[in-house]
Amino acid sequence: LEWLEALESGAYEQGKDCLNKDNKFCCLGVACDILSKKGTVLKTVKENGIVDYDNLSTILSEEVIDLLKLNGSTGGFWNIRDEFPHLSLASANDGGKTFLEIAAFIRKNPDVVFSDAREVQ
């Protein structure tokens, strides 16, 4: 997935609490940035440095959820794995997991992260 490759690339600086603030990204904000560059998602930069994607700055829009095949606006998990004690991708990001750790978890557990892992390749 292009999104996971971007998380692993080191091209994005990691941030917390917003999808993108001052060019520091949540793991979900990286996906939004990729989609905005493709013209799929509307990107709006506000004066305070916070970036909205489809008019949202802290959670994913329904369109992005559907495009990424995620379980909800924060990338929630339906099942929790002991080695990754978070309830969502957003909480993992804000709780200190690195982009590399998040990408590795997604690759190892697509059935937990995606609503239909068979459709995500």
Regions found by a protein language model. Name each.
Residues L1-F25, C32-Q121:
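Domain-length accessory/inserted modules outside core catalytic folds
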